[in-house]
């Protein structure tokens, strides 16, 4: 990293969600690409901001940027598969927050060779992660007929992916309109 280096923050716009505050502080200029609304803790040194809260996922936005940049290099099959996996994750396999733009981007990625077998491998949950997700689900309690609140073990730390997957799994259950998962993280 030098004074000409550029940090690109993707799928978040909060400085405290970067991997490391020390790492973030090493950059003078930042680009933000996100599909969440701009919030507090936004970088003051952003030289470019591409925030589209109507987009299905950050992968959709990244693909659009790459698709229309006009560079002669094309995405590889694995790169196309990774971006497609991200879109499929955020849209729950094209069932929520999908727009015509989402399908246009998916079609473009498919034309580049995104592979469903690769996507399955990328998206697979390992056994230990699956157990942690289910631990949170089992801890869930209905506070009303359509709302579930789950609380993690206070002596354990859970990562954000496990927490989100537990909440999404419960939200997909019949009759459930809202889920809340409260758990300790390493942050």
Which residues make up each language-model segment?
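N-terminal small/polar loop signature for handling phosphorylated ligands or for N-terminal nucleophile
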Residues: 1-25
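Hydrophobic helix-and-loop "lid/oligomerization" segment in the mid-to-C-terminal part
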Residues: 1-4, 92-187
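Solvent-exposed alpha-helices and their adjacent loops that cap or buttress functional pockets
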Residues: 2, 22-25, 42-43, 75-77, ...
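Short alpha-helices
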Residues: 35-106
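Structural motif
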Residues: 5-8, 29-31, 178
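Catalytic-core regions built around general acid/base machinery
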Residues: 22-27, 105-108
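Short helix/loop capping segments that flank catalytic or ligand/cofactor-binding pockets
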Residues: 17-19, 41, 96-97, 159
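Short glycine-rich anion-binding loops that position phosphate/pyrophosphate groups of nucleotides
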Residues: 12-15, 36-38, 154-155
